[in-house]
Amino acid sequence: DLRMSRGLGDVYKRQIVYKGMFLVGQLRTFFRDLQDVDYESAIAMVHSRFSTNTNPSWERAHPNRFIVHNGEINTIRGNADKMLAREETMSSPMLQDELHKVLPVVNTQGSDSAMLDNTLEFLTMSGMDLPLAVMITIPEPWANNDTISQEKRDFYQYYATMMEPWDGPASILFSDGDVMGAVLDRNGLRPSRYYITNDGFLILSSEVGVLEVPEEKIVLKERLHPGKMLLVNTVQGLSLIHI
């Protein structure tokens, strides 16, 4: 079925995206390569919930190319309109007359998650590191925040001239295959909790108890704080950064 095949998933140099309109327990049965005992990955992002603001479809099913998302982006219409308006002034010395082939940046027929994913993909494919792109699109509250450094305040003020916040109650996980991170909206309206185990695993989820972990293996229990980012670099090992 052609319509279904467009939403089955994606394959990249460092990532494979599996998706479908079924329960988590059915995923391995549907995609048989997941049954192979030799199949290994340092990163796994799983999204399992029903759509709230859009009708369910293969194309809108999570994960997206870079993110999984629990929540809503309430500013999505303004965000999408701004991205489309920027296309009028876009230029590229590399693409030149072929720039039109990468436009539009956002697919306005997609979900709010998909349009944010479109934007992050555009920024990273333009040479920006994914964590930086996430900080620009989902900034912490900085304008009247006396607890952040002047350097970070200057960072947000600079990029605020180029990108408006994608705002709303949201917990977002992101990965490019090498780094994996999580960010919580500035108001902390979605839960995100994580464990670190003594055998080197980091487990983050919106609910406690998603995976059964013996208490004696847990070396750290923590939650993601509003507007903050958790980042792990798998190339450098389990380096945990709380930005």
What residue ranges belong to the model's regions?
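Conserved catalytic micro-motifs used in adenylation/nucleotidyl-transfer and phosphoryl/amide-
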Residues: 44, 57-73, 77, 164-204
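Phosphate-interacting basic helix/loop segments used at nucleotide- and nucleic-acid interfaces
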Residues: 151-170
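Active-site-adjacent "gating/activation" loops or surface patches in catalytic cores
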Residues: 33-56
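C-terminal, non-catalytic interaction/recognition modules in large multi-subunit enzymes and RNPs
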Residues: 36, 167, 177-180, 184-199, ...
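Single conserved hydrophobic/aromatic residue that forms the stacking wall/gate
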Residues: 2-8, 12, 241-242
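Short, flexible loop/turn elements at secondary-structure junctions
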Residues: 47-52, 72, 174-176, 208, ...
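Acidic loop->beta-strand submotif enriched in PP2C/PPM serine/threonine phosphatases
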Residues: 55-65, 215-222
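Conserved catalytic alpha/beta cores of large enzymes that bind or transform nucleotide phosphates
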Residues: 74, 80-81, 88-152, 209-240
